[in-house]
A protein has these predicted regions:
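Short, basic/aromatic beta-hairpin or loop at an interaction surface
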Residues: 1-12
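Short, charged beta-turn/beta-strand-edge "cap" motif at the junction between a beta-strand
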Residues: 17-19, 36-41
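Short, compositionally biased
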Residues: 43-60
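Short, compact, well-ordered microdomains
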Residues: 6, 63-94
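N-terminal first-folded block
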Residues: 10-22
Length: 94
């Protein structure tokens, strides 16, 4: 696969962990994600994040009532050990 990035950079930052994440994610962890880069995320969590990562990577946005069109916060499906991550589209100056 090529080295050239396609679209915008998308960075995920772990905002909270309730319980113990079996994949080892910790508050403050940052990962770069894309359609071709899972960033070593838990596979189950990445599966849920994928549509949002792709939308941010290729210029889509969220409705105004959600706040910032470049940012979304998501939580994993393990509600006993819930990890919350903020996905952010990085503009050229970030």
């Amino acid at each position: 696969m090529g080295e050239d990035r396609i679209g915008f950079r998308v960075v995920g930052t772990v905002r909270s962990v309730k319980g113990h994440c079996n994949a080892g994610h910790k508050v403050g962890d940052q990962v770069e994600l894309s359609g071709h880069n899972t960033g070593n995320m838990c596979g189950f969590f990445y599966h849920d994040l994928f549509p949002y990562v792709i939308m941010l990577q290729f210029g889509g946005g969220f409705p105004p009532e959600w706040g910032n069109p470049d940012v979304v916060e998501m939580s994993c499906m393990d509600k006993m050990n819930e990890v919350t991550i903020e996905l952010k589209r990085m503009r050229d100056n970030e």
